[in-house]
């Protein structure tokens, strides 16, 4: 379980204050208007920024003083996920060893992950020779080989066309289900949330204003801000 317990952060006199609990195995879409605090929340969880007060716990253990590399998360962003001078094989391999000193079993893991996301035939190519969708598949494969129980996704597929975006979301959902991965994904697309998520967390005015099962993400929700967001998105 991931818990944000009265996590407060101030940026340019704007106060963000988050309370959120995510159960193991849930896929949670983090949604809300631009500037509401979605990426701030994700950055606090990842450890890129540190709260002024409050606690962040994973399975009961505080991680608030840990550096990003010490936290049990794999991360995937919209871009800048791959090293341009490394092959697909090595980019995936970084998920297992930062110095790429892989055992025979780990090399096999890399190949299996590439196979699962559909990039096995590109293992020896550089990222510049791949399409945008193929590059994101490689980045997803690197997440997959890491032993972390949770993925943090910050609009990783928003730049892709709708068909490819749907394909990638289905792949994330499938891989997460197979391994029991918990997913927290920022998205602006209501359709993406409903395609992949079991639950949602709606951020507005610097706080988590509403949470629930994904079927409750409708224009009939009690939150007026959420109602307006859903109507605008639809």
UniProtKB/Swiss-Prot annotation:
Could you tell me what this protein is called? Thiamine import ATP-binding protein ThiQ
Top EC class for this record: translocase
Q: Name one GO molecular function term.
A: ATP binding
Q: What is its EC number?
A: 7.6.2.15
Q: Which domain of life is it from?
A: Bacteria
Family to which the UniProt record says this protein belongs: Belongs to the ABC transporter superfamily. Thiamine importer (TC 3.A.1.19.1) family.
Q: Where does ATP bind?
A: 32-39
Q: Which InterPro entries match?
A: AAA+_ATPase, ABC_SmlMolc_Importer, ABC_transporter-like_ATP-bd, ABC_transporter-like_CS, P-loop_NTPase, Thiamine_ABC_ThiQ
Provide the alphabetized UniProt keywords: ATP-binding, Cell inner membrane, Cell membrane, Membrane, Nucleotide-binding, Translocase, Transport
Domain ABC transporter as annotated: residue spans: 2-230
Q: What does the record give as the function of this protein?
A: Part of the ABC transporter complex ThiBPQ involved in thiamine import. Responsible for energy coupling to the transport system.
Q: Partners and quaternary state?
A: The complex is composed of two ATP-binding proteins (ThiQ), two transmembrane proteins (ThiP) and a solute-binding protein (ThiB).
Among the Pfam families in the record, one is: ABC_tran
Membrane topology, record value: Peripheral membrane protein
Q: Where in the cell is it found?
A: Cell inner membrane
Q: Cellular component per GO?
A: plasma membrane
Q: Which reaction does it catalyse?
A: thiamine(out) + ATP + H2O = thiamine(in) + ADP + phosphate + H(+)
Annotated NCBIfam families: PRK10771.1, thiQ
The major lineage groups are:
Bacteria, Pseudomonadati, Pseudomonadota, Gammaproteobacteria, Vibrionales
């Amino acid at each position: 379980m991931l818990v944000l317990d009265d996590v407060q952060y101030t940026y340019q006199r704007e106060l963000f204050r988050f309370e959120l609990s995510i159960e193991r195995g849930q896929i949670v879409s983090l949604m809300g208007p631009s500037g509401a605090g979605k990426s701030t929340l994700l950055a606090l969880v990842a450890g890129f920024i540190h709260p002024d007060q409050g606690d962040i716990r994973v399975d009961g253990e505080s991680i608030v003083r840990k550096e990003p590399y010490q936290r049990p998360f794999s991360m995937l962003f919209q871009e800048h996920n791959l090293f341009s001078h490394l092959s697909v094989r090595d980019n995936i391999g970084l998920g297992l060893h930062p110095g790429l000193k892989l055992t025979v079993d780990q090399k096999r893991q890399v190949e299996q992950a590439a196979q699962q996301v559909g990039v096995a035939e590109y293992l020896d190519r550089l990222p510049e020779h791949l399409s945008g969708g193929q590059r994101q598949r490689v980045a997803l494969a690197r997440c997959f080989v890491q032993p972390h129980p949770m993925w943090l996704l910050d609009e990783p597929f928003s730049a892709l066309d709708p068909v490819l975006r749907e394909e990638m979301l289905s792949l994330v959902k499938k891989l997460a289900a197979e391994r029991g991965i918990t997913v927290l994904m920022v998205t602006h697309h209501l359709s993406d949330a409903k395609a992949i998520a079991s639950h949602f967390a709606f951020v507005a005015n610097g706080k988590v204003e509403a949470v629930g099962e994904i079927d409750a993400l409708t224009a009939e929700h009690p939150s007026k801000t959420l109602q307006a967001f859903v109507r605008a998105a639809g």
